[in-house]
Amino acid sequence: MRSALTAIALLALAGAAFASPAQTPPTPEAAATLVIYNHTDPQSQALAKYYAGRRGIPADHLLGIDCSSKEEISRDEFLVDIRSPIRNAFTAHGWWRVETGEDGQHYVRSASIRFVAVMRGVPLKIQSSTRDTALEAHADIQPGTPMALIAGQNEACVDSEIAAMFSLIPETAGFIPNPYFQQSVPALTLPPAHTPLLVCRLDGPSDAIVRHMIDAAIATEKTGLWGWAYLDERSILSPGYVVGDEWLTSAGSAMRRQGIPVIADYASEVLPPGFPMTDAAVYYGWYTQDVAGPFALPGFKFLPGAVAVHIHSYSARTVRDPNAAWAGPLLARGAAATMGNVYEPYLELTVHLDILQDRLMNGLTLAEAAYTATPGLSWMNVVLGDPLYRPYQSWSALTPTTGVHPNIWQRYRQIVLDANGDPLQAIPELTKLAIDAKTSMPLEALGQAQAAAGQFDTALQTLRDAAKVEHSRLIRFRLALERIEILRRAGRKDDAVEAIKEDLGTFDSDEEQTTLGRIALAINPPPPPTPSPIPSHTP
């Protein structure tokens, strides 16, 4: 990921069983949604009809376009085969009202379509071209500067170009500042001049995965997204990159305040393959090119409805391979929603994960949350998932249905909310919940919150107490790994190494031993080999 602090200056220039696939009653958002599919691909059309039926989207809001089925296309192919028919359809169906302003420019004054679902089969990205006219919008930028480098790029994600359609700019290089960035209100409450078209893609390695994304989103809205949030930070100090960790830290703090239990790792390496990621509902992390860590293991699965994002420059260079990059693999492993980059975006122009998570928790749809968290349009970003998905919709009905007992996650959340969003003020209640429910989860979440607050010794003791009530060997192993990580963060490297030696005697499976060995090498790497002396020349 290349960092571009100057990009900021450029901005200133601007398990569960799913219900049968019955039709969901239409919502205002569904009535404002357009579904775009590849008319030459029968599977793309079938997926479009399936999604529209599940969400109650009007049948006349399905738009088939004749386009390539390749993931990467040329700029000319995009303009002729994708953008032109979409614009023509908006005009022909009266989906927008375009007027000429006093300055002679055209403006979208109103629009009945505000959300777009792009189906599998429609191209993903537009390769770079050598069009000189693309730089006209940035004629004020001095050639040869970093900003000129960004402004001169005209490769882009297809979806991000469609999202910029309300701007009516003929063609751009660089990015267009997103007017919806950092907003916090539903898109339908704003005029189209203040929002982009909110474009998400229902795409992935297979048709079955796309159907799962649709079904999981709708089912989770009814049952709730309950489980762990996993954060994988890097502890990076470079000024150009530290913002990535800051997003994750901020997202973690917000989730803890909302009663979502968080497990955070701060080692510079990605989570090791043997790290037990159970009940994964949310994952935010960085930074490797291709899927790695626990996600690369056979059998790993997210909870249905999970939201998972891995920051990398090319995390969505393809979405159709279950083992390449990150977007496709995360979806193949059960996530319902992810975001990524089809080409190099620069870090500051990727999705701001703290804003994304905040807006999701405050009831916005996936499309709304994603675009409030994305600084630019006509750029490299892609959102994969049902645009209308609200993962925390069930939070508006905290009282369980009569006769239905709240699950452990709901009980944990209610305790934290009763403590004004601070797990550290609910130690007796969380301890009692762990003992009564015979699970370590409340204490593990408490220990993580204590560690995040810098209370390392207290956190270590809490995690030891958690291990005493936990019956699962897998979870006890994770608790051991968390204690080792806290010792490392506290600067107690020798104690961390001793803890690893002790745990090697307790956790003796091949996978456990390998995981502990990798962590030991990361904490205490062997010294580099001593170079051989240069032989002296003897005359």
Predicted features along the sequence, with ranges:
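Caspase-like cysteine protease fold
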Residues: N362-G421
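Generic helix N-cap/helix-start motif at coil->alpha-helix transitions
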Residues: V404-R411, A437-E444, R473-L481, D510-T515
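Structured catalytic cores of large enzymes
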Residues: E71-T249, A254, W379-Y392
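C-terminal soluble interaction/assembly domains
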Residues: F300-A373
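Structural motif corresponding to the intra-repeat A-B loop/turn of tetratricopeptide repeats
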Residues: N420-G421, A453, A490, I523
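Structural register within alpha-helical repeat arrays
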Residues: R413-Q414, L446, R483, A520
